[in-house]
């Protein structure tokens, strides 16, 4: 049995979250494949630095300290050299951006460093808890994306032909959000795309299920920004989930469900600190019920425009 777990930045706020993650992995039957986002707030810091690289002098030092607070001993471990390599890569990208701000290759490498650091932190911590884990870079093992620079989705067909399955033995911690673009350079998915990375990997390895661990207990029927208190939807069909993700559901990336619907892999969305008997959302095959409204979505800042024109004959009158 293979379970793909995805832990986002909201589940990587401090070292206590790593303790909880290790408990989750130990309680999972069969093999666990882990996909991670950057630690909470890291991507935003890297993005700001990409806009003002000349003034990001303390960034590398601050990121080093932050990640070592999460996982002490990482720098001295057997993957410490990888940690140093990522930090040096950040410095290099900042220098390249300072010289040429429109260098999108350097910008993407800079932004992807958050996921690389996170994978190292989580993997090292799991090893200290007796879990045989290792970090994996998505583009290094053949995960291909449909685009260059920025890509909408993982290219499942190309990835299936190139994926190095041997690197996914044990308990791998895989970087989310990016992969190899069609031009051979690193490419990024949209923000929140680590969920899509997780479901794409599940499709490629024929996993039994995917669990997206969040700081919310599933998909809510109404966006919480509306200020209406609700409880999570217990079950959504693949089609329903895809429709909600395109409208107003911040929990789901629009491309998340598609790789699972194609092969029937179930998806669970769970709160990291709530047990399974609490609220959660399971996404699976569509169950048609024409009288059951499960959620309400709304696209903000959209206007309806109607244009009427006269025919050439009418205009000539």
What residue ranges belong to the model's regions?
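Nucleotide/pyrophosphate-binding catalytic subdomain
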Residues: 1-257
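A short linear-motif detector with a strong N-terminal bias
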Residues: 12-14, 246-247, 262, 283-287
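Glycine-rich beta-alpha junction loops
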Residues: 39-40, 216-218, 271-276, 287, ...
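Alpha-helix boundary/capping detector
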Residues: 152, 228, 267, 286-287
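A broad, low-specificity signal marking well-ordered, structured residues that form hydrophobic/aromatic
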Residues: 172, 187, 267, 281, ...
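Conserved glycine-bearing catalytic or ligand-binding loops at nucleotide- and phosphate-handling centers
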Residues: 248-255, 259-279
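A conserved regulatory-domain signal marking ACT and ACT-like small-molecule sensing domains
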Residues: 279-317
């Amino acid at each position: 049995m293979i379970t793909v777990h995805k832990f986002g930045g909201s589940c990587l706020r401090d070292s206590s979250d790593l303790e909880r993650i290790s408990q989750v992995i130990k309680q999972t039957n069969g093999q666990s494949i882990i996909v991670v986002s950057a630690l909470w707030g890291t991507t935003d810091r890297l993005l700001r630095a990409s806009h003002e690289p000349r003034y990001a002098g303390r960034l590398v030092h601050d990121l080093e300290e932050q990640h070592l607070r999460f996982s002490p001993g990482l720098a001295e471990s057997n993957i410490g050299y990888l940690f140093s390599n990522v930090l040096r890569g950040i410095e290099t990208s900042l220098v390249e951006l300072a010289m040429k701000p429109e260098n999108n290759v350097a910008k993407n490498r800079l932004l992807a460093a958050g996921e690389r650091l996170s994978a190292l932190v989580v993997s090292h911590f799991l090893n200290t808890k007796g879990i045989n884990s290792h970090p994996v870079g998505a583009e290094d093992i053949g995960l291909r994306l449909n685009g260059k620079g920025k890509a909408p989705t993982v290219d499942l067909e190309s990835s299936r032909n190139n994926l190095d399955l041997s690197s996914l033995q044990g308990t791998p911690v895989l970087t989310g959000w990016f992969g190899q673009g069609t031009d051979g350079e690193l490419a990024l998915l949209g923000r929140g795309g680590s969920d899509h990375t997780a479901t794409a990997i599940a499709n490629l390895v024929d996993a039994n299920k995917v669990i997206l661990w969040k700081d919310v207990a599933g998909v809510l029927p109404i966006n919480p920004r509306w200020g209406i208190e609700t409880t999570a939807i217990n079950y959504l069909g693949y089609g329903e989930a895809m429709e909600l993700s395109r409208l107003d559901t911040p929990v789901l990336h629009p491309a998340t469900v598609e790789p699972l619907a194609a092969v029937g892999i179930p998806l669970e969305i769970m709160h990291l600190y709530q047990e399974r008997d609490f609220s959660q959302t399971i996404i699976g095959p569509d169950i048609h019920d024409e009288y059951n409204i499960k959620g309400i979505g709304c696209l903000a800042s959209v206007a309806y425009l109607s244009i009427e024109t006269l025919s050439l004959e009418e205009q000539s009158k």
